Amino acid sequence: MKASQFFISTLKEAPADAEIVSHKLMMRAGMIKKLGAGLYTYMPVGLRVIRKVEQIVREEMNASGAVEVLMPVVQPAELWQETGRWDKMGDEMMRVKDRHERDLVIQPTSEEVVTDIARTEIRSYKQMPVNFYQIQTKFRDERRPRFGIMRGREFTMKDAYSFDRDAEGLKVSYEKMYGAYTRIFQRFGLEFRAVAADNGAIGGSGSHEFHVIADTGEDAIVYSPDSDYAANIEAAEALAPAMPRGAATEALTKTHTPKRAKCEAVAEQLGIALQRTVKSIVLAKDVEGGEPQIWLLLLRGDHELNEIKASKVPGLADFRFATEGEILRAFGTPPGYLGPIGTKQPVKVVADRTVAAMSDFVVGANEEDFHYTGVNWGRDLPEAEVYDLRNVVEGDPSPDGKGTLAICRGIEVGHVFMLGTRYSESMSATFLDENGKTQPMMMGCYGIGITRILGAAIEQNYDARGIIWPVSIAPFEVVICPVGYDRSEAVRAEADRLHAELAAAGIDVILDDRGERPGAMFADWELIGVPFRVVVGERGLKDGKLELQGRRDEAAAAVAPADVLATLKSRLAQ
């Protein structure tokens, strides 16, 4: 391809509303153009990257035995009403009416539609396993679209849905998809981690997220450097302390702590470690036809509540944080001085595993400007129910018993779920087993954010000059930059010869024949991020050399024209 037959439109400065690196560089490189809030046109450079991402995904999905379909973007509301998600999805799901006043959905995902396909097409256990996948547009009406394509409203996603006869079959399908995803991200050339995850709103049992590692990632990834253990922060288990609880050595004392509403301030006044303080978090669980049930969760002063874990405490599903009025009624004091001793109303007390192992600790006294010191379980307050309630921190023991935990940042780009029978039961997607009995299908779902991959890849691979694409998903593998293409017959002839030679060898190459000055030409392609550049100039030709430089190379190498193809093949294969 020649640049004169392509479309290149770069910017020296990013638009003012571009917040993160990938958004800025995609706008500057002319990959995307903003149309509205969270809505982008993919320009030729960006679309070429998308097509390469799609190709890798499609090849690995097909190799895994999945079958491609294409489901409509607009879907009837009746299917979503069957599963209850018409009401549960909230405002992120775009609802519209057609001219006949029929309710429709602009799909955010396709569990309902694919389950409808399965219940009408699959009758017998002999037709399973089957895995349908699509690469299709999705729409989620984000409250605050931001970060370019990383949190846009319209995006492209690969979503797959497996159907099996039993849990064992689902496990096999899940492992196939896990393996396919691993190969996909390896082929992308990105540093990534697959981590154990919570299933969230989609539901089901097993779940893993695939994260591209990047310092700017929104998600905290927990892993052990000494093993394969990895999980997102929501799912990582915080083990109970290995040491048993120490004996009480202090008397219970009510201590004046004026204007010390935070654990840090209390610890500073008392001259103790923050780890000896306990924070109180008040939750409420609404009861139909009655007063809300108030819960008091106790965490060590330096730890943070994990809301996902809290929601899994028996009786705390769908909790909310208590209002100030509810707190005053239950404890008689505003937040900052709350504790489990001497509450005004009965509350349900739950302690984190770490707190349950503490002795001689500090809690609020349920009186403004006062805390209790020397608090001990069994003596000063009854033993509480104990659960894992907190986020892990660096240095915690790994749940697999191998080493201690480290934390990095990641961008979620893929997710695999074991759905089980959640959708098949609600939509009556059943089959006849070998005994002629009706059984619900076991489902799995598997998503990859196709367009999100672009942003994540850039967040991981860039420098001051622009994007640095991995070879497999770069818009072009090689750019030929002739200096004086429109002035020198020798330069033009060699550039055209090399372009034809590389293209014939199957290399994705573009020849910049726009006649730009060398500095501007080089800057454009460094910004766009093409992995390799070959410079053809009169001076080099006189010496029998061309300049070849990788995007990450500090300097160009002089290569004989006859050796460029072999050199590039070797570099591209690395």
Swiss-Prot record:
**Gene Ontology terms, MF aspect:** aminoacyl-tRNA deacylase activity; ATP binding; proline-tRNA ligase activity
Q: Which UniProt keywords apply?
A: Aminoacyl-tRNA synthetase, ATP-binding, Cytoplasm, Ligase, Nucleotide-binding, Protein biosynthesis
Q: What reaction(s) does this enzyme catalyze?
A: tRNA(Pro) + L-proline + ATP = L-prolyl-tRNA(Pro) + AMP + diphosphate
InterPro entries to which the protein is assigned, alphabetical:
aa-tRNA-synt_IIb (IPR002314), aa-tRNA-synth_II (IPR006195), aa-tRNA-synth_II/BPL/LPL (IPR045864), Anticodon-bd (IPR004154), Anticodon-bd_dom_sf (IPR036621), Pro-tRNA-ligase_IIa (IPR002316), Pro-tRNA-synth_IIa_bac-type (IPR004500), Pro-tRNA-Synthase_IIa_type1 (IPR023717)
Record field: transmembrane: none
> What class does this enzyme belong to in the EC scheme?
ligase
**Keyword match Aminoacyl-tRNA synthetase:** yes
Could you confirm whether the keyword Hydrolase appears in this record?
no
Q: Name one GO cellular component term.
A: cytosol
Q: Which SUPFAM superfamilies match?
A: Class II aaRS ABD-related, Class II aaRS and biotin synthetases, YbaK/ProRS associated domain
Read off the PROSITE patterns from this record.
AA_TRNA_LIGASE_II
Q: Which Gene Ontology BP annotations are present? A: prolyl-tRNA aminoacylation
How does the record comment on the protein's domains?
A: Consists of three domains: the N-terminal catalytic domain, the editing domain and the C-terminal anticodon-binding domain.
Its job: Catalyzes the attachment of proline to tRNA(Pro) in a two-step reaction: proline is first activated by ATP to form Pro-AMP and then transferred to the acceptor end of tRNA(Pro). As ProRS can inadvertently accommodate and process non-cognate amino acids such as alanine and cysteine, to avoid such errors it has two additional distinct editing activities against alanine. One activity is designated as 'pretransfer' editing and involves the tRNA(Pro)-independent hydrolysis of activated Ala-AMP.
Q: Which family does it belong to?
A: Belongs to the class-II aminoacyl-tRNA synthetase family. ProS type 1 subfamily.
Relate the assembly described in the record. Answer: Homodimer.
* Protein name as it appears in the record: Proline--tRNA ligase
